[in-house]
Amino acid sequence: MMSGPRLTHIDSAGEAHMVDVGDKAETERVAAAEGFVRMRPETLALILEGNAKKGDVIGTARLAGIMAAKQTSNLIPLCHPLMLTKVSVDIVPDDALPGLRIEAMAKLKGRTGVEMEALTAVSIACLTIYDMAKAADREMEIGGIRLVSKSGGKSGDYRRGGDQD
């Protein structure tokens, strides 16, 4: 039998389980993720001018992303509850898209990584943007949600290479 990548959440009987991280060393863990919401140029202008019916789209989406990162273990069944030390969500306009680009970073000192927290922050920020602007543009597209980098832990550091939009 070949040795290679394996699914850590599946036991020898093929059953899903939560990984035991009790014996792992505590290290600083940082992960970054990104995504985008593509929309019509006039929808982007509406958001940037602060004229969306539901209010401050970017500010609300930023807070939603931060709140979501803190709730990841309640949303994804096998994620450990974590004591995050920092979560940031940055949302910037991109006229070339056109739309908004979302980047999130999650950090802690602990025994397991924060990739899912960063990805959850981006996902929920994107969904919040869609929710708040859907009255103006139901054809918005959410995409490109992916891990950009992670550091810390036994598996080492990772940085996504090349532009893969």
From Swiss-Prot:
Matching InterPro entries: MoaC, MoaC_bact/euk, MoaC_sf, MoCo_biosynth_MoaA/MoaC, Mopterin_CF_biosynth-C_dom
MF GO annotations: cyclic pyranopterin monophosphate synthase activity
GO annotation, biological process: Mo-molybdopterin cofactor biosynthetic process
Catalytic activity: (8S)-3',8-cyclo-7,8-dihydroguanosine 5'-triphosphate = cyclic pyranopterin phosphate + diphosphate
Highest rank taxon of the organism: Bacteria
Binding site for substrate: 78-80, 116-117
Keywords (A to Z) from UniProt: Lyase, Molybdenum cofactor biosynthesis
Active site: 131
Pathway: Cofactor biosynthesis; molybdopterin biosynthesis
Disulfide-bond pairs as recorded: none
CDD domains: MoaC_PE
HAMAP family registered for this protein in UniProt: MoaC_B (MF_01224_B)
Description of how the protein assembles with itself and partners: Homohexamer; trimer of dimers.
Role of this protein: Catalyzes the conversion of (8S)-3',8-cyclo-7,8-dihydroguanosine 5'-triphosphate to cyclic pyranopterin monophosphate (cPMP).
Family according to the record: Belongs to the MoaC family.
Protein's name according to its UniProt entry: Cyclic pyranopterin monophosphate synthase
Gene coding for it: moaC
